[in-house]
Amino acid sequence: MDSRLTIVDVTGSTNDDLLEAGKQGAPHGTGLAARAQTAGRGRRGHKWDSSAGNLLLSIVLRPCVNPAKYSGLAAVSGLAVLEALEKQGLANEIRLKWPNDLVARGHKLGGILVEAARDNEGKPFAVCGIGVNVNYVPSEVPDGGLPAIGLSDLNENVPAIDVLLKEVYHAVVSAVDAWADLLNATEENAGPLAPVHGQYVAHLNWIGEHVIARSPAGDELARGIFKTVDAFGRACIETEGGLRSFHFEEASLRPLSE
């Protein structure tokens, strides 16, 4: 196991722990995994069931890019998690769901939470939290959410969680480093997803399908065909009135059939 990656039995939230460590100057690539969390959370503060038996990992990231580009980190990390699972022969049915989930068979397999902050010297950093259901599948379905599924439901032979942790950890750090290098080689006004845009869209769920965009409060914002996600991370929907784009803080998507 990499010396930068620490595994503990239980903590409140690995993201909270590393946000504090990051403020104290923890370096790029500092990783913390837990067997269980008592206060795990996802996007918009939703509770993340973090019982034992699943992959729970957070990583301090200090990519050498304009922090305004940090909005690309969730997509880059999601692709990296897919790559790590693919190396273990586990990714055949897994797709990315905009903006930050892993899904399979219409169920939620995992999620990614990226939180940006500044350390005590004013330097920017981010913490990327990754949760993947492996052996334990939460039974509770959040309002407007998808039911859960685990890697053990998709595959007969799932490696030990520590093996998966190592693969995911190294994949994410390597992917972020490569993304930062490529982003710095592009035009200054390029979108944060520019270096991985084609790859990201190719792995997205529901592209070309009819979807509904809903606000955080559950109100319908638009319905139409999910065309793509642009290089700035906005979901683009072709509606009867024309193309509309939504930032991840504005909306979430669901298939129209639901």
Pin down the residues of each PLM region.
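Long, positively charged amphipathic alpha-helical accessory segments at protein N-termini or as interdomain linkers
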Residues: S71-E93, A104-E258
